[in-house]
From Swiss-Prot:
The lineage of its organism: Bacteria, Bacillati, Bacillota, Bacilli, Lactobacillales. One of its GO terms (molecular function) is structural constituent of ribosome. Signal peptide: none annotated. InterPro entries: Ribosomal_uS2, Ribosomal_uS2_bac/mit/plastid, Ribosomal_uS2_CS, Ribosomal_uS2_flav_dom_sf. Gene3D superfamilies: Glucose-6-phosphate isomerase like protein, domain 1, Helix hairpin bin. Keywords: Ribonucleoprotein, Ribosomal protein. It comes from Streptococcus pneumoniae serotype 2 (strain D39 / NCTC 7466). GO terms for biological process: translation. This is Small ribosomal subunit protein uS2.
Amino acid sequence: MAVISMKQLLEAGVHFGHQTRRWNPKMAKYIFTERNGIHVIDLQQTVKYADQAYDFMRDAAANDAVVLFVGTKKQAADAVAEEAVRSGQYFINHRWLGGTLTNWGTIQKRIARLKEIKRMEEDGTFEVLPKKEVALLNKQRARLEKFLGGIEDMPRIPDVMYVVDPHKEQIAVKEAKKLGIPVVAMVDTNTDPDDIDVIIPANDDAIRAVKLITAKLADAIIEGRQGEDAVAVEAEFAASETQADSIEEIVEVVEGDNK
């Protein structure tokens, strides 16, 4: 039973790729057709690869893997944070700071500073400091929380990285590859899939598409951690829904539409 139905993918707009002139030829085998200058992703393949990604993430979580969710563009930021928190994992949803993984020691020092400022506020230190100094500390804390708040409690370098739009997050992907961290990613038609270990061919520019895929991978983590199928009821319901009978229906849906 597929973890995501064709109907769900269609409704979320997962099939819309980029303009044909912006494509990466290495994504050709994941593209079904082209309509009005837009590539249409083969959702039959998306269903298959989403299943593989789900299994990979579930098995990793069952082995107590630390998973880092990465998505810094506005279409991904909320879903990445919400689903990482829901699944008990960690996230970066603003600008990726170079060296976040490859210079982990320095990042840990900045996180320690963030925690120190928080303690200063909690233990009353702020009350005896000059207002200007408190204002500077609050500004520093806000900046640190913005960029590092999602990994503040991450116990170690992640065992798995999930990325929305690896084309945009190239630095993050390169750091993961350098450290041998497997990367699971939503891969759109403008992206080179070669650096991704577990791909999900999908529209990574639509909020609903990002939310759907990201939530399913969070479900996989929850299932892996619980040691049971925590989303069996939801999956059964999805399977009972009316689904697209064939890939040709996708063409009918997207005829005349643009990304």
